[in-house]
Design a protein with these regions (language model features):
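Beta-propeller fold detector
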Residues: 88-100, 137-147, 190-208, 264-287, ...
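Structural motif
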Residues: 75-81, 126-131, 177-184, 241-259, ...
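Conserved beta-propeller blade signature
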Residues: 68-73, 79, 118-121, 128, ...
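Short loop/turn segments that connect beta-strands within beta-propeller blades
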Residues: 83-86, 131-135, 184-188, 259-264, ...
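Structural signature of eukaryotic scaffold interfaces centered on beta-propeller domains
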Residues: 59-66, 107-116, 148-169, 211-232, ...
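An edge-strand/N-cap motif at the start of beta-rich repeat modules
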Residues: 63-90
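Ser/Thr-rich, Pro/Gly/Ala-heavy low-complexity intrinsically disordered linkers and tails
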Residues: 1-65, 350
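Blade-level signature of beta-propeller repeat domains, shared across WD40, Kelch, NHL, RCC1
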Residues: 311, 316-351
Length: 351
């Protein structure tokens, strides 16, 4: 899953699933909005794109085709992305019509996509049901959140049966305090379903942490996938000296795996299954940076997690050990989030 604006090298992506991915036409890229702070952005493209990957099922029984929706976004604009084509350019869909105006929040901080391809977004104080209408991303529903004194940076859907015993998927938001909250999409009611726990001495690969024992903070995003009834979850986190304050945090993000069983319980329990590793540059990869941070958007595909950094970089992260390769530099495009359907293929790392 790549947005390639200025090629900076690549790592091989997983190839467990093949198919073709259709997006909208071209269109100019936009200067991204900035995190949860006010910034300007212009978009001149008039294109639309659904970001829909279609693959035919294999094996006996003739499984029907499945649509995989995948997106990335800046503070103010939505793009479709192609998980199967590392060299494919992003396709600008359009600007969010509920962001940046009078009385509106300044930036969309993340989005989530359910198994039906429906898109929901989140900002500092609200959630939105999003629909693509021509070259505009319309906020069809806007619900104000009773914000628990921390900014929401991450959004995903918990697959059916995780937080609800029915076939219903549930929206889950993550905040700077390292807390996960289910979100009622009818009225915005928040219910806590865990935290990321505390920072260990090291990541299991010999890389130590300066803030051992402190609560993990969410660096930017979470992603959950159904995985055929064996759900998988990941988060990009960081260690900070005084959580939930974002000052003085480690300049290297860490990939963690989520215990989807513990997520079901209401409360402040740790739901971290395993620290996969710090996002350090893999041997043989290009790019000047030796570590990666501010992964405000992540989306999983096969054995990789793709990170969209607010530092204008897109990286491919190994979901086993957190090692990372720079895939693209995106000057003047500051990523705020990413989302992929809960039906996206994933190769679960060993526990």
């Amino acid at each position: 899953m790549i947005l390639l604006l200025a090629t900076a090298g690549a790592c091989a992506a997983g190839t467990a699933t093949t198919g073709t991915f259709g997006t909208g036409g071209g269109g100019n890229t936009a200067n991204g909005g900035g995190g949860a702070t006010s910034s300007s952005q212009s978009s001149t493209g008039s294109d639309v794109g659904g970001g829909t990957f279609t693959t035919s099922g294999t094996g006996t029984g003739g499984a029907p085709p499945v649509d995989f929706a995948a997106y990335a976004h800046t503070g103010k604009a939505l793009y479709s992305i192609d998980p199967m084509a590392p060299s494919a350019a992003p396709k600008l869909i359009g600007n969010f019509d509920c962001i940046g105006g009078t009385g509106q929040d300044s930036a969309m901080t993340d989005l989530a996509v359910n198994q039906s391809g429906d898109i929901w977004g989140i900002s500092d104080t609200k959630i939105y049901r999003l629909t693509v209408e021509g070259s505009v991303v319309h906020c069809a529903t806007t619900i104000t959140l009773p914000n628990p004194n921390a900014v929401f940076y991450g959004l995903t859907f918990a697959p059916a049966g995780i937080l609800d015993d029915s076939t219903k998927e549930v929206l889950v938001a993550g905040n700077t305090a390292g807390q996960l909250w289910s979100v009622d999409t009818t009225n915005g009611t928040l219910t806590q379903h865990g935290t990321f726990g505390n920072v260990p001495a090291n990541d299991g690969h010999g890389h130590s942490y300066d803030n051992k024992g402190k609560a993990w903070e969410l660096s930017g995003d979470i992603v959950f996938l159904a995985n055929g009834g064996n759900p998988v979850g990941f988060a990009a986190v960081r260690d900070c000296p005084n959580p939930p304050s974002t000052s003085g945090c480690n300049a290297t993000d860490t990939l963690i795996a989520i215990d989807m069983t513990k997520l079901k319980s209401v409360g402040s329990q740790s739901v971290t299954l395993k620290v996969r590793g710090q996002m350090l540059k893999s041997a043989g990869c290009s790019g000047a940076d030796t570590a990666y941070e501010r992964m405000l958007g992540i989306a999983a595909w096969n054995d990789k997690v793709y990170g969209f950094s607010h530092n204008s970089a897109i990286v491919e992260i190994d979901n086993n050990d957190g090692s990372a390769c720079l895939v693209a530099s995106t000057p003047n495009v500051f990523w705020n989030g990413a989302g992929v359907t809960t039906l996206a293929p994933v190769i679960k790392p060993p526990e």
